[in-house]
Swiss-Prot record:
Could be involved in septation. SUPFAM superfamilies: SpoVG-like (SSF160537). InterPro entries: SpoVG, SpoVG_sf. One of its GO terms (biological process) is sporulation resulting in formation of a cellular spore. This is Putative septation protein SpoVG. Belongs to the SpoVG family.
Protein backbone atom coordinates (compact mmCIF):
# COMPACT_ATOMS: atom_id res chain seq x y z
CA UNK A 1 0.00 0.00 0.00
CA UNK A 2 1.21 3.45 -0.87
CA UNK A 3 0.47 6.56 1.18
CA UNK A 4 -1.11 8.93 -1.33
CA UNK A 5 -2.28 11.76 0.94
CA UNK A 6 -1.71 13.04 4.47
CA UNK A 7 -4.00 15.79 5.78
CA UNK A 8 -3.43 17.57 9.05
CA UNK A 9 -6.95 18.40 10.21
CA UNK A 10 -6.34 19.99 13.62
CA UNK A 11 -3.25 21.63 15.09
CA UNK A 12 -2.81 22.20 18.83
CA UNK A 13 -0.07 24.29 20.42
CA UNK A 14 -0.97 23.31 23.96
CA UNK A 15 -1.02 19.90 25.60
CA UNK A 16 0.60 16.66 24.48
CA UNK A 17 -1.70 16.02 21.51
CA UNK A 18 -0.27 18.21 18.75
CA UNK A 19 -2.43 17.28 15.74
CA UNK A 20 -5.14 15.04 14.31
CA UNK A 21 -4.38 13.59 10.89
CA UNK A 22 -6.11 11.63 8.10
CA UNK A 23 -4.07 9.36 5.82
CA UNK A 24 -5.18 8.04 2.42
CA UNK A 25 -3.72 4.84 0.96
CA UNK A 26 -3.68 4.12 -2.79
CA UNK A 27 -6.26 6.90 -3.33
CA UNK A 28 -8.81 4.30 -2.18
CA UNK A 29 -8.78 3.93 1.62
CA UNK A 30 -8.59 6.56 4.36
CA UNK A 31 -7.84 6.31 8.08
CA UNK A 32 -9.04 9.28 10.16
CA UNK A 33 -8.16 10.42 13.68
CA UNK A 34 -4.49 9.47 13.81
CA UNK A 35 -3.01 11.63 16.55
CA UNK A 36 0.42 13.26 16.72
CA UNK A 37 1.54 13.08 20.36
CA UNK A 38 4.50 14.73 22.11
CA UNK A 39 6.14 12.12 24.33
CA UNK A 40 9.25 12.13 26.50
CA UNK A 41 11.36 11.02 23.52
CA UNK A 42 9.80 13.31 20.91
CA UNK A 43 6.82 13.11 18.59
CA UNK A 44 5.05 9.86 17.75
CA UNK A 45 1.74 8.79 16.24
CA UNK A 46 -1.20 7.14 17.99
CA UNK A 47 -3.59 5.17 15.83
CA UNK A 48 -7.36 5.67 16.18
CA UNK A 49 -8.70 3.71 19.13
CA UNK A 50 -11.78 3.10 21.23
CA UNK A 51 -12.27 2.37 24.90
CA UNK A 52 -13.44 -1.13 25.82
CA UNK A 53 -15.99 -1.73 28.61
CA UNK A 54 -13.01 -2.72 30.79
CA UNK A 55 -11.51 0.75 30.32
CA UNK A 56 -8.70 -0.41 28.04
CA UNK A 57 -7.97 1.37 24.74
CA UNK A 58 -7.77 -0.80 21.61
CA UNK A 59 -6.60 0.36 18.19
CA UNK A 60 -9.30 0.34 15.52
CA UNK A 61 -6.73 0.13 12.71
CA UNK A 62 -2.96 -0.16 12.90
CA UNK A 63 0.12 -1.26 10.93
CA UNK A 64 1.03 -4.90 11.52
CA UNK A 65 4.80 -4.51 11.24
CA UNK A 66 7.36 -1.95 12.38
CA UNK A 67 8.54 -1.09 8.85
CA UNK A 68 5.04 0.02 7.84
CA UNK A 69 4.59 1.91 11.13
CA UNK A 70 7.89 3.73 10.56
CA UNK A 71 6.90 4.73 7.00
CA UNK A 72 3.52 5.95 8.22
CA UNK A 73 5.00 7.88 11.14
CA UNK A 74 7.65 9.49 8.91
CA UNK A 75 5.05 10.65 6.35
CA UNK A 76 2.74 12.00 9.05
CA UNK A 77 5.44 13.83 11.01
CA UNK A 78 6.83 15.42 7.82
CA UNK A 79 3.38 16.73 6.91
CA UNK A 80 2.79 17.86 10.51
CA UNK A 81 6.01 19.93 10.45
CA UNK A 82 4.94 21.55 7.15
CA UNK A 83 1.48 22.36 8.52
CA UNK A 84 2.97 23.78 11.71
CA UNK A 85 5.34 25.98 9.70
CA UNK A 86 2.54 27.19 7.40
CA UNK A 87 0.37 27.93 10.43
CA UNK A 88 3.10 30.01 12.10
CA UNK A 89 3.63 31.97 8.86
CA UNK A 90 -0.04 33.00 8.89
CA UNK A 91 0.24 34.59 12.34
Amino acid sequence: MKITDVRVRKLNDEGRMKAVVSVTFDNEFVVHDIKVIEGQNGLFIAMPSRKTPEGEFKDIAHPINSDTRNKLQKAILEEYEKAKENNSNKE
